[in-house]
Amino acid sequence: DQDCLPGWSFYEGHCYKVFNVKKTWEDAEKFCQKQSNGKHLATIEWLGKANFVAELVTLMKLETHVWIGLRVEDKRQQCSSHWTDGSAVSYENVVHNTKCFGLDQKTGYRTWVALRCELAYHFICMSRVPR
């Protein structure tokens, strides 16, 4: 629909597809990129998109977490976010190897959960609508 490739779903100028295979976070991102130019693991920047993605994933009946395109790049660096008192957020308290994020199956895929990047889960790719 809306010029997405067959099997992909349209929402707000992008196409999305949940893949029924399990990969590590890094392999899932590489897989998405190979689908064609401009594809990556899905990003979720607002509630409407979060709800759309949750519904799309729920339809697959996967029963596992699902990778999204969020990862802490370097736990030694401070995040660009800040606490309300202005101090920088650091990830020193994050469990080692827990720097990749997925949609939490237990909440109907409506919240994010920090996961070990080397574990294999299903994943959702997104791309801009082809012109």
Swiss-Prot record:
Domain called C-type lectin: residue spans: 11-126
Keyword Disulfide bond attached: yes
Record has Ribonucleoprotein as a keyword: no
GO molecular function, one term: toxin activity
Chief location: secreted
Disulfide bonds: C4-C15, C32-C125, C100-C117
Subcellular location: Secreted
InterPro entries referenced in this protein's UniProt entry, alphabetically: C-type_lectin-like, C-type_lectin-like/link_sf, CTDL_fold, Snaclec
UniProt KW keywords: Disulfide bond, Hemostasis impairing toxin, Secreted, Toxin
GO cellular component: extracellular region
Expression tissues: Expressed by the venom gland.
Family indicated by similarity: Belongs to the snaclec family.
Assembly information from the UniProt record: Heterodimer; disulfide-linked.
Described function: Interferes with one step of hemostasis (modulation of platelet aggregation, or coagulation cascade, for example).
Note: Shows greater sequence similarity to the alpha than beta subunits compared to other heterodimer snaclecs.
Protein name as it appears in the record: Snaclec A13
Organism, scientific name: Macrovipera lebetinus
